[in-house]
Amino acid sequence: ERPIKNRYAVLGVHSTSQLKYWNHPDGIKVMQDAPNWNVLCDMLRKAGITPVVTEKDELYGHPPYYNGIPKKSVKKLGISLMDTINYIEHSEFFIGLSSGLTWLAHGLGQRVAMISNFSEDWYEFDLNDEKYVRIVNHDVCHGCWNRAGVDFPFISKDWFWCPIHKDTPRHFECHTSITPQFVFDSIKKWI
């Protein structure tokens, strides 16, 4: 049964490493406010789409920085897996990071827009699948995940792992370079 009568999209805003997050140009200190996601939520609402977040946690990350849920979304936090599946199945589409919820949405046959610039285009899903949009910026550093173990070691205990630009102004530029407008333009065909 459809959980919301209006048209809506499910957003997957959390992941398992800061490298996978949609980081903001102002740095990780602002991430608990989910600035990029809030701007995208405004754009979706103006287009008649209600943004819904079905994450387990309101905040997720590593001290002293945590990533938050967009305040401008409908929050369905900590719901059961079956309820999460129901929300995703009946949504217009899913927008997320490289994360379990994105894989779940893809497995359910839902249209998926994945914000993922740390891995190469071919890595997660079939680029020929019309239900899949890969949101990337090839004009900046990207794809380090697919070179880990070859060109440099992956350090799993380092939440802020960025093998090329860590602790420089370019730290996480793979995702800070992706704007809410770029994401919105990438999914316009589904609205």
Regions of interest found by a model, annotated:
Residues 1-31:
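Mid-sequence helix-capping/hinge segment at a functional interface
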Residues 7, 72, 168-171:
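Short amphipathic alpha-helical segments
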Residues 11, 86, 185, 189:
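Charged/polar, solvent-exposed surface patches and flexible loops
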Residues 12-22, 53-64, 145-162:
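Short regulatory "switch" loops immediately downstream of catalytic or recognition motifs
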Residues 26-123:
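Donor-binding and catalytic core of enzymes assembling or modifying cell-surface/extracellular glycoconjugates
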Residues 106-191:
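Nucleotide-sugar donor-binding patch of glycosyltransferase catalytic domains
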